[in-house]
C-alpha cells in the first residue's frame, strides 16, 4: 500500500473542502471523489470541480449514481418541499437521503483500495446534523469495522481509515479553519435548493449563515454570493 494518500469525499460544501485541505496540509496526496446522485442542488458538483482545481488535488473523480430513481428525500424528489421553517430539534429532516453516505463511503473504499490510498476523508459533522443517522460517531465506528472486514487490506491488517476530522467541531470552528487554510469559501455551495443563488432559508443555508455571522464574515453569507 502506498502511504499518505487520501480519498476525499468532495461534495462542494465547506465541510468536505476543509477536511480535504487538512489532509493536504498534513502532507497527504488527495484524490477528490464526488457524486452526481440525482440531487436537485446540482450546483454543488460545479463547486466541487472548482474546488478540486483551486486546491490542486491529485485527481478528481465524479461518479453518477441515480438515487432519485426511488426518491425518499426532498433532495432527490422535487415533489417534496425543502424545509424552510427553521431547524427542528430531535427529528430527522426530509433532506436526509436514505443510504447516501453508506453508498458513498462504500464506493470510496473501493477506489481507495484500488488506488492504494490509506484513508478516506469525510466531512460529516455530528454537531450540525445530529438528526442524520449517518453523521454520528456510532455510525462511523460501525462502518470502520465493516471496512476492515470487507477489504483485502483490512484483512491483512492495513485497513483503510475512515477519517472524519470535523465530526465534533462547531460550524464556527470549521469556517475559521477554512479561512486559515485559505479555502475560497465563496466557491463552496451549501444550499439545498436547485437555484442559481442560495435561498438563505433551508437548514444548510441557515447553519452556514449563522456561523459566518458569528465569526464576523457576513460578507460570505448566502445573500452575498
From Swiss-Prot:
EC number: 6.3.4.20
Keyword terms of this UniProt record: ATP-binding, Ligase, Metal-binding, Nucleotide-binding, Queuosine biosynthesis, Zinc
Keyword field contains Ubl conjugation: no
UniProt-listed GO biological process terms: queuosine biosynthetic process
Binding site for ATP: 10-20
Enzyme kind, highest EC tier: ligase
Free-text cofactor note: Binds 1 zinc ion per subunit.
Binding residue positions for Zn(2+): 191, 199, 202, 205
Pfam families xref list: QueC (PF06508)
Family: Belongs to the QueC family.
Protein function: Catalyzes the ATP-dependent conversion of 7-carboxy-7-deazaguanine (CDG) to 7-cyano-7-deazaguanine (preQ(0)).
Classification via NCBIfam families: 7-cyano-7-deazaguanine synthase QueC (TIGR00364)
Protein name (Swiss-Prot/TrEMBL): 7-cyano-7-deazaguanine synthase
Gene coding for it: queC
Amino acid at each position: 500500500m502506498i502511504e499518505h494518500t487520501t480519498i476525499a469525499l468532495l461534495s462542494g460544501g465547506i465541510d468536505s473542502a476543509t477536511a480535504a485541505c487538512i489532509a493536504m496540509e498534513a502532507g497527504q496526496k488527495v484524490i477528490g471523489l464526488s457524486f452526481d446522485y440525482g440531487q436537485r442542488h446540482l450546483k454543488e458538483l460545479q463547486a466541487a470541480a472548482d474546488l478540486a482545481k483551486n486546491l490542486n488535488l491529485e485527481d478528481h473523480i465524479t461518479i453518477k449514481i441515480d438515487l432519485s430513481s426511488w426518491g425518499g428525500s426532498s433532495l432527490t424528489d422535487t415533489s417534496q418541499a425543502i424545509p424552510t421553517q427553521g431547524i427542528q430539534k430531535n427529528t430527522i429532516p426530509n433532506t436526509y437521503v436514505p443510504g447516501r453516505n453508506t453508498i458513498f463511503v462504500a464506493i470510496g473504499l473501493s477506489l481507495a483500495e484500488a488506488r492504494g490510498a490509506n484513508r478516506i476523508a469525510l466531512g460529516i459533522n455530528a454537531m450540525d446534523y445530529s438528526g442524520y443517522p449517518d453523521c454520528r460517531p456510532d455510525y462511523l465506528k460501525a462502518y470502520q469495522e465493516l471496512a476492515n472486514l470487507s477489504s483485502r487490506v483490512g484483512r491483512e491488517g492495513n485497513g483503510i481509515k475512515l477519517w472524519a476530522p470535523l465530526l465534533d467541531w462547531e460550524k464556527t470552528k470549521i469556517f475559521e479553519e477554512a479561512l486559515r487554510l485559505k479555502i475560497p469559501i465563496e466557491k463552496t455551495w451549501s444550499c439545498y435548493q436547485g437555484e442559481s443563488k442560495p435561498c438563505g432559508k433551508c437548514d444548510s443555508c441557515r447553519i452556514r449563515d449563522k456561523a459566518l455571522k458569528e465569526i464576523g464574515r457576513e460578507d460570505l453569507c448566502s445573500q452575498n454570493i
